[in-house]
Amino acid sequence: MLTANTIIIDVRTPAEFAEGHVEGSINLDLESGQFEAELPNLDPAQPYIVYCRSGRRSGVAVEIMKASGFTQITDYQTLENAANKTGLPIIE
């Protein structure tokens, strides 16, 4: 669920992110190691929405976050699903 405190994370590559992303999302590429490198800088008490292209990478990211003590995580799987469920536009 989207609140004023929700952080939206796009775990796709920077090239994919540049092609289109949910407004206000941050890009933390799972495959390059950027996601795991930045994880200690994220607040586990905040709510998060995670998405990618197909749901595979976002699912992996959510499992990593859960193992690191994050509890308020929603996996919206795809860019389109994240945009629809949050009501936010896709920025290209």
Sequence positions of predicted segments:
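Rhodanese-like catalytic fold shared by cysteine-dependent sulfurtransferases
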Residues: 2-7, 14-46, 56-92
